[in-house]
């Protein structure tokens, strides 16, 4: 990690994390965040519009805003400001998918930072920025040939690999471990003893809970917003009902509870979340993805993280919850570590007279 005291050697760069529905960006010098911005644009816009124009425009605005901010707040002449200006953009997430800027193929697990950095690609998009852009690859697990009878071992990620590198670098996890990322999708990522990404397992649970809240007969029984707190007795009741009757029946039980005037909407949502947690956790334990000897680091929506931690601790699986600030720090650390390694490799190639890989 760069020394905080010697700022002359710290890289100033723009970091980007693009998801399905939004994009986050940070201007950093070394390990310090100078500014952060966001945009409600993601790769879903490309899929919907069948054009990357909105993604390109959002990136152009974010990068331009950072560059303008530096020039505005500094009274130093431009000729003396060179070392304080961003030298490149490093981006992870769906930006490296076919719906992003350019496709960077998934790497086959197991992989660590060395393999990820070696496969990252430098690209140029003059219509967006004159800065070089580093696209970080995602990771896939399972056999190369996907078939219906091996689909249970197949999974993909984009962005979480960078988060995992940061978590390990900062000591938030001690491999072998599992990172549980809870958002629209719930993803369990296994890290081996060397800290490499070994495999992952993703479910649609987050989206299904949201769909139940807004698109099913359960909508009137549940709050419109996502859970802000979990009513633990109701969550545990939902877990028990799922184990007794299955997920679909447990979900319909929310409607029955409403008809019987049992519980507030927020409590019934805790019941539903408990059913999904039990369904997923039991499957992961059965596959030995989760086990007593594996530390679990939980990131994502705070209420869901609290629900999962409670459920895991009840099964004697050690689990800790990372705050949103810690999660952001880990993601940015992962981005920075990968970028610094890529810049070192780029400099080495330049000294040898080789041309860096570029689209």
Predicted features along the sequence, with ranges:
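Glycine-rich phosphate-binding loop plus the immediately following alpha-helix
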Residues: 44-48, 140-240
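N-terminal phosphate-binding loop and adjacent alpha-helix
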Residues: 35-86, 97-99, 103, 218-221, ...
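Short glycine-rich, Thr/Ser-proximal phosphate-binding strand/loop in the N-terminal lobe
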Residues: 13-54, 321
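Adenine-nucleotide phosphate-binding core of ATP-dependent small-molecule kinases
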Residues: 240-283
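Short beta-strand-loop/turn "lid" adjacent to the catalytic site in phosphate-handling enzymes
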Residues: 69-154, 193
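Glycine-rich phosphate-binding/hydrolytic loop that grips phosphoryl groups
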Residues: 310, 322-345
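Glycine-rich phosphate-binding loops at beta-strand->alpha-helix junctions
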Residues: 22, 293-311
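Short, low-complexity, charge-dense intrinsically disordered segments
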Residues: 345-359
């Amino acid at each position: 990690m760069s020394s905080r005291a010697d700022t002359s050697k710290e890289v100033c760069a723009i970091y980007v994390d693009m998801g399905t529905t939004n994009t986050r960006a940070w201007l950093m010098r070394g390990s310090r965040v100078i500014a952060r911005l966001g945009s409600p644009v993601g790769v879903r816009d490309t899929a919907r519009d069948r054009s990357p124009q909105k993604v390109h425009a959002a990136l152009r605005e974010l990068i331009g805003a950072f560059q303008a901010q530096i020039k505005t707040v500094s009274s130093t002449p431009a000729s003396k400001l060179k070392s304080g200006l961003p030298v490149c953009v490093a981006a992870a997430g769906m930006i490296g998918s076919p719906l992003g800027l350019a496709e960077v193929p998934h790497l086959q697990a197991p992989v660590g930072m060395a393999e990820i950095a070696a496969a990252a690609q430098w690209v140029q998009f003059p219509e967006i920025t004159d800065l070089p852009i580093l696209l970080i690859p995602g990771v896939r697990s399972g056999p190369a040939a996907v078939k219906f009878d091996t689909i249970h071992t197949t999974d993909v990620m984009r962005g979480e690999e960078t988060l995992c590198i940061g978590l390990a670098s900062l000591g938030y996890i001690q491999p072998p471990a599992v990172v549980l990322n809870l958002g629209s999708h719930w993803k369990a990522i296994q890290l081996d003893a060397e800290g490499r990404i070994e495999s992952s397992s993703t479910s649609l649970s987050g989206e299904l809970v949201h769909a139940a809240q807004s698109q099913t007969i359960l909508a009137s029984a549940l709050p419109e917003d996502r859970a802000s707190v979990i009513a633990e007795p109701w969550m545990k009741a939902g877990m028990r009902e799922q184990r007794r009757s299955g997920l679909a029946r447990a979900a319909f039980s929310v409607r029955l509870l409403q008809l019987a005037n049992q519980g507030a909407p927020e409590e019934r949502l805790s019941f539903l979340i408990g059913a999904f947690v039990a369904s997923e956790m039991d499957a992961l334990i059965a596959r030995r993805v989760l086990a007593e000897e594996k530390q679990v680091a939980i990131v994502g929506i705070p209420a869901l993280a609290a629900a999962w931690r409670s459920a895991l601790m009840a099964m004697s699986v050690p689990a800790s919850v990372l705050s949103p600030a810690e999660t952001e720090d880990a993601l940015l650390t992962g981005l920075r570590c990968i970028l610094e390694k890529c810049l070192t490799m780029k400099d080495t190639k330049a000294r040898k007279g080789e041309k860096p890989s570029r689209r």
